[in-house]
Amino acid sequence: MVIANSNIIFVAGLGGIGLDTSREIVKSGPKNLVLLDRIDNPAAIAELSALNPKVTVTFYPYDVTVPLDETKKLLKTIFDKLKTVDLLINGAGILDDNQIERTIAVNFTGTVNTTTAIMDFWDKRKGGPGGVVANICSVTGFNSIYQVPVYSASKAAALSFTTSFRKLAGITGVTAYSINPGITKTVLVHKFNSWLGVEPRVAELLLEHPTQTTLQCGQNFVKAIEANQNGAIWKLDLGRLDAIEWTKHWDSGI
């Protein structure tokens, strides 16, 4: 996908990985970058606008846990303004296994609902033009961090949803791929709660291992966007971008 002159919606594009990815996207010159986030960050939005004045950067407050109909209303506002949207990035995520319901609501249900909502505007069965979805999942969808099983399971669920959804492209006209960062130096991983307190030092232990910066992750994210491979399972780890070959152990046969 060519980012230049495109219209992109980025859910949670003002966080750690999100903000550095937004910077890299803006450098590539989209026509519009629409940021949907729970918390406003005027300084970051001003920075992004100044980085490339030819890009229109817009912010709308959005919590991915709202009912599906509210998401549809917000997207209608955006589509009424832009007319077309080329790419939806679902990037909302929390890491706190003390908050079981919210972890599932943000990391999994929010991704499903935002994707479902945009189908009203993209699905070719409804006369839509199609589009592209990039879902930020996690390497924990491959192998869990067992001390945070709720987080790991929520990301595995988001990955499974994405791998199923991309197979529907022939029916819907909408393609999809997953972005799976490894341990990245963000606020998210500096301090978080393990499930039932099974490992109070889990954040500290993780950070003893090699990590990557949000800039490295953002740069590789843009490479994945440009590659635009339907069904790709991208691993963004240690400053590298690698396509994962999924091992098939079972097939529904339908």
UniProtKB/Swiss-Prot annotation:
E.C. number(s) listed in UniProt: 1.1.1.1
Organism: Drosophila adiastola (Fruit fly)
Keywords: NAD, Oxidoreductase
GO MF terms, alphabetically ordered: alcohol dehydrogenase (NAD+) activity
Domain of life: Eukaryota
Record text on subunit structure and interactions: Homodimer.
PROSITE patterns noted in UniProt: ADH_SHORT (PS00061)
Residues reported to bind NAD(+): 10-33
Catalytic reaction equation(s): a primary alcohol + NAD(+) = an aldehyde + NADH + H(+); a secondary alcohol + NAD(+) = a ketone + NADH + H(+)
Family: Belongs to the short-chain dehydrogenases/reductases (SDR) family.
UniProt keyword annotation of NAD present: yes
InterPro entries: ADH_Drosophila-type, NAD(P)-bd_dom_sf, Sc_DH/Rdtase_CS, SDR_fam
Cellular-component GO terms for this entry: cytoplasm
EC class of the enzyme, as a word: oxidoreductase
Disulfide links within the chain: none
Gene behind the chain: Adh
SUPFAM superfamilies per UniProt: NAD(P)-binding Rossmann-fold domains
GO biological process: alcohol metabolic process
Enzyme active site: 151
Name recorded for this polypeptide: Alcohol dehydrogenase
Binding residue positions for substrate: 138
